[in-house]
């Protein structure tokens, strides 16, 4: 009897999904918490659940130096393009680019950046041309990278590059970040403009990286009040998180009225993450995706942090099923990495009875004070900003419209061609 991985599907949402089979083969180092290999696990699960049949699969053109220069400095891009583990000692200004233990130089660094950035840029292009309702690139979402330096395991800020592309067609772009770390690189890039509203839900306080994202960071000049920060304490659970997430996002939608959304789904906000300190379940995390999706606004869905590899794969696979309106079986299908999911072999593990690593330090009164302050700031906006968009600049990447006429038969052929994700 064939194992039924899909329990229900009523999807009318047009979804495209970006994956390059090489992206999971890059290696930060033996003791580094960032493991691109998590992408291999994610995509193998997506395939074995049959979710690829509910969306169009793409291998994006890797971003080149010209693409990266839309945001990053020439010196920095040149450094990324030419530095290798073999020649790094020849560079006198490595510290200027913040290269070190957190952001090491590893074999294929530039190619890795090109691949994950290319998926985000091309996803933005397809949304711009109204080819899809949702574009997914789990390899993207590296939100800490700055204009001229690496930061927090991030080298090229694919999110900023994608938003710059979206701004060619959209007057207002909303960026939402549910990573446990503050989306500082994206906030900094758009801190002075009202055309991008950044909304970040994150741990704040003490020495927790990156140390930014207090509620009083609201933007400046034209961008004043267009940076929204929700600083949270350790141990927040699904109920408390959603009780602040939903009213804040509803308020943002009511007052800002974006025409496109970028959603960064960092999975380090999950319970038991290697570096995180929240207590979200996969279903709670995915409820944020479901809520954003309910507004029926074109959305670019990206990855981000996440350092307990098996849970990252579980989370992003489940959120892929949410994007394509498909209910999947909680029992994992057999896949190339099945041993990673021992001993339960469940998509959403049952943690009932297990002790919390972090107690919930978010009081009801504190969360309510955040909600009140943020909604007060949103009301000051009064109306959504508008701009006159004149001649639209050319796309960063050329669009091949013929690729979007793929039938289900062609999708199955593509699955066979790209079936090896190891």
From Swiss-Prot:
UniProt keywords, alphabetically: Chromatin regulator, Cytoplasm, Hydrolase, Metal-binding, Nucleus, Repressor, Transcription, Transcription regulation
Subcellular location: Nucleus; Cytoplasm
Gene Ontology CC terms: cytoplasm; nucleus
GO MF term (any one): metal ion binding
Active site: 144
Gene3D superfamilies to which the protein is assigned, alphabetical: Histone deacetylase domain
InterPro entries: HDAC_PDAC, His_deacetylse, His_deacetylse_1, His_deacetylse_dom, His_deacetylse_dom_sf, Ureohydrolase_dom_sf
Enzyme class: hydrolase
EC number per UniProt: 3.5.1.98
GO biological-process terms attached to the record: epigenetic regulation of gene expression; sporulation
Main location: nucleus
Bias kind Basic residues: ranges: 413-422
Disruption phenotype: Develop normally but when mixed with wild type cells they sporulate less efficiently than the wild type. Do not show major alterations in gross histone acetylation levels.
Chain intervals for the UniProt region annotation (Disordered): 399-422
Reaction equation(s) it catalyzes: N(6)-acetyl-L-lysyl-[histone] + H2O = L-lysyl-[histone] + acetate
Regulation: Its activity is inhibited by trichostatin A (TSA), a well known histone deacetylase inhibitor. Cytosolic activity is refractory to inhibition by TSA, while the nuclear activity is inhibited completely.
Annotated binding of a divalent metal cation, by residue: 179, 181, 268
Protein residues bound to substrate: 102, 152, 307
Keyword set includes Transcription: yes
Protein family membership: Belongs to the histone deacetylase family. HD type 1 subfamily.
Role noted for this protein: Responsible for the deacetylation of lysine residues on the N-terminal part of the core histones (H2A, H2B, H3 and H4). Histone deacetylation plays an important role in transcriptional regulation, cell cycle progression and developmental events. Histone deacetylases act via the formation of large multiprotein complexes. May play a role in the regulation of the timing of gene expression during the development and in the definition aspects of the phenotype that mediate social behavior in genetically heterogeneous groups.
Protein name per its UniProtKB record: Histone deacetylase B
Lineage: Eukaryota, Amoebozoa, Evosea, Eumycetozoa, Dictyostelia
Gene (UniProt): hdaB
């Amino acid at each position: 009897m064939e194992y039924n991985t899909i329990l229900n599907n009523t999807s009318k949402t047009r979804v495209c999904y970006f994956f390059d089979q090489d992206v999971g083969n890059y290696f930060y180092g033996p003791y580094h918490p960032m493991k691109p290999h998590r992408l291999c696990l994610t995509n193998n699960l997506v395939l074995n659940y049959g979710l690829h049949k509910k969306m169009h699969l793409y291998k994006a053109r890797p971003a080149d130096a010209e693409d990266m220069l839309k945001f990053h400095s020439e010196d920095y891009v040149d450094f990324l393009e030419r530095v290798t583990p073999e020649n790094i000692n020849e560079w006198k200004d490595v510290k200027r680019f913040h290269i070190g233990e957190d952001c090491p130089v590893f074999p294929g660094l530039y190619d890795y950046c090109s691949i994950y950035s290319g998926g985000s840029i091309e996803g933005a292009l397809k949304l711009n041309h109204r080819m899809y309702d949702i574009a997914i690139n789990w390899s993207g979402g590296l939100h800490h990278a700055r204009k001229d330096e690496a930061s927090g395991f991030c080298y090229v800020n694919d999110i900023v590059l994608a938003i710059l592309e979206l701004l060619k067609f959209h007057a207002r772009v909303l960026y939402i970040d549910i990573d446990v770390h503050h989306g500082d690189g994206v906030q900094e890039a758009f801190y002075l403009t009202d055309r991008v509203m950044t909304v970040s839900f994150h741990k704040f306080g003490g020495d927790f990286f990156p140390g930014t994202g207090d509620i009083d960071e609201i933007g400046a000049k034209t961008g004043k009040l267009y940076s929204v920060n929700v600083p949270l304490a350790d141990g927040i659970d699904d109920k408390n998180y959603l009780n602040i997430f939903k009213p804040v996002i509803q308020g943002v939608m009511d007052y800002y009225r974006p025409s496109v959304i970028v959603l960064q789904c960092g999975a380090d906000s999950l319970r038991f993450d290697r570096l995180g300190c929240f207590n979200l379940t996969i279903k709670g995390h995915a409820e944020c995706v479901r809520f954003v999706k309910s507004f029926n606004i074109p959305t670019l869905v990206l990855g981000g942090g996440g350092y307990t590899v098996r849970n990252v794969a579980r989370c992003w696979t489940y959120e892929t099923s949410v994007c394509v309106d498909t209910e999947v079986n909680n029992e994992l299908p057999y896949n190339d990495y099945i041993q990673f999911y021992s001993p339960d072999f469940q998509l959403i593990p049952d943690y009932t009875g297990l002790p919390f690593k972090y107690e919930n330090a978010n009081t009801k009164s504190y969360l309510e004070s955040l909600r009140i302050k943020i909604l007060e700031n949103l009301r000051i906006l009064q109306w959504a900003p508008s701009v006159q968009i004149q001649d639209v600049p050319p796309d960063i990447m050329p669009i091949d419209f013929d690729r979007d006429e793929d039938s289900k038969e062609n999708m199955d052929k593509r699955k066979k061609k790209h079936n090896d994700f190891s």
